[in-house]
Amino acid sequence: MKATGGPLPLILFLLIIIVLITAQHTAIAKPFFSLNAFAQGQPNDKDDQNMGKFYVYNKAQTNNYADQRMRKFYLYNKDQANDWDDQKMEKFYLYHEGKTNDRDDQKRKNIYLYNEGHANGDDQTMEKFYLFNKDQAKDGDDQKMGKFYLYNKDQANDWDDQKMERFYLYNKGHANEGDDQTMEKFYLYNKGHANEEDDQTMEKFYLYNKGQAKDGDDQKMEKNYLYNKDQANDWDDQKIEKFYLYHEGKANYRDDQNMEKFYLYKKGEEHKYIHSHGHGHVHFPEGAKDLYFFEDNLAPGSVLITRILSARQSSIFLHRNNSKHIPFSMKNITDILTMFSPVSATMADGIAATLQACEHTGMVHGEKAKCATSIESLLDVVVSSLGTKLVRALTPGAPMEGVPSLRYIVASATPVPNSQSMLACHDMLYPYKVFFCHTPKQTRLYQVSLVSGESGRPLIDGLLAVCHQNTSDWDTGHPFFHFMDVKPGETTACHFFGRGSIIWVPVPSVKEATQ
């Protein structure tokens, strides 16, 4: 017999609502309701097809099956066609903390809300809400953790979550055998998330702790990614700010074995670190090839196609009696960001990158590296690194906006005396001036003047170029070898310094100069 389409279910529903409202305004304590209303034509006691069905349980419900000590509420409309997938229906569940069903909702709060458009198992075109507490004990993917999902109405696919807001938060106790063992993991997608693969037009943030044990690419290391909204390609990460830091214990069989690796890309340009010649497989876009050249290219009259990167506006340089009272450590990064708030996203990234670089100053090939956070500490670094107080400071004459990649003619190139033992200090992005200083070995410094061979620009004078004389122990994956098509040890490697650097060289004493 087919269920009737009359107003009976609606009338019963309204009667129950009236009873509930009336009970709330009477002196009767703890009203008990256990009401069942079936449409006249209910054909089957199991699947409730083609009928209206309505249950209300209070806390005292003592059924020995699925609904002990809980309130449970179902509302199906007339078109409910299947008890499994609940197509073309409204369905509402609410479980108390005391829910003790042996199935999938043990010891947790679970709230589902489906709108009329719920069509199948992937919950397309619906609102969906999950909340698991830490005691959730399901054998699936949510063991011993807090997990939170929020999908908006535009959710179009349960796999890639396009055009939606999505939020994950895992606590340290996450014990799933998948990709998140013993780690904290945090995702934040904005409304513009359009693709699971490349994450264009979105903010994305990953943080892995040292205990990350996945057999993939992040073994025994700290890894930090930060993408801004302009991220345009998941492969080369051009036009983004991206930050990597690998510990020496990195054990991946790929390109980062047993080394420290530090990359920092600035938005829209291939900025740093062209000076980190011993630090692994640095990936630069094709435009970076003009950063490098050979020492022979510095001969006067030679044609040189090169570029010099832009520099930041200079920040203030503190004295030691001021800087010593300001925390300077990654463990205090929250306090530092608060102290200098409000800070832009770019500055926040720079603070983190600077702190990481200054806390991991281990270099290769005998180089020394230190950071200076004050005028006095910079002088201390210079003296301790070069072993003398007789020093000369040189600053590049490159313009703040840098030098574009064009065809230039070398007007002059003068070697700087004693530059075989030099100290290069690079201005870091920080609320006040911080220098990262290191001592590259076997170098030769040149003061260079260039004349544009294309645009008729005036003479560019006072440039500083460094040539590394021995590249035999450089990493084979360095971009210099890739772009210049040479092998380690075959030739010298040269590049210009940007305006934000200071180069220090020792000055011979009078006695040494007369010998």
Swiss-Prot record:
InterPro entries: BURP, BURP_dom. Expressed in shoot and panicles. The keyword Glycoprotein applies. This is BURP domain-containing protein 9. Keywords: Glycoprotein, Signal. Residues 1-29 form the signal peptide. Glycans are attached at residues 321, 332, 470. Residues 292-507 form the BURP domain. Pfam families: BURP. The gene is BURP9.
